[in-house]
Amino acid sequence: MSNSSNSTSLSNFSGIGVGVILTLVILFILILALLCLRVAACCTHVCTYCQLFKRWGQHPR
C-alpha cells in the first residue's frame, strides 16, 4: 500500500518538476531574446551615432 502511494507521489512530483523546468526554460529563452533585441538596438544606435560623427567630421562647421 505504501509503495503504490509512494510511486504516485513521485510521478506527481516528476510531472511538477517537468512543468517547472519547462517554464524556467521558456523564461530563460524569453530573457535571452529580450537581451538580444536590446543589444541589437544598442548596436543600431551606435552605428547611427558613428555615421553622424563621420558626417560631422567630413563637414565641419
Swiss-Prot record:
Post-translational modifications: Only 1 of 3 three potential glycosylation sites is glycosylated. Oligosaccharides are not processed from high mannose to the complex type because the protein is retained in the endoplasmic reticulum.
Membrane topology per record: Single-pass membrane protein
Key words of the record: Glycoprotein, Host cell membrane, Host endoplasmic reticulum, Host membrane, Host-virus interaction, Membrane, Transmembrane, Transmembrane helix, Viral immunoevasion
Glycosylation sites: N3, N6, N12
Membrane-crossing segments per the record: 15-35
Cellular compartment(s): Host endoplasmic reticulum membrane; Host cell membrane
This protein's GO CC annotations: host cell endoplasmic reticulum membrane; host cell plasma membrane; membrane
Topological domain ranges for the Cytoplasmic compartment: 36-61
Lumenal face residues: 1-14
Function per UniProt: Prevents infected cell apoptosis induced by the host immune system. May act by down-regulating host TRAIL receptors. May act in complex with E3 RID alpha and beta. May play a role on cellular apoptosis regulation in the ER.
Summary of subunit composition and partner proteins: Interacts with E3 RID alpha and E3 RID beta.
Family note: Belongs to the adenoviridae E3-CR1 family.
Name under which the protein is recorded: Early 3 Conserved Region 1-alpha protein
Protein species of origin: Human adenovirus C serotype 2
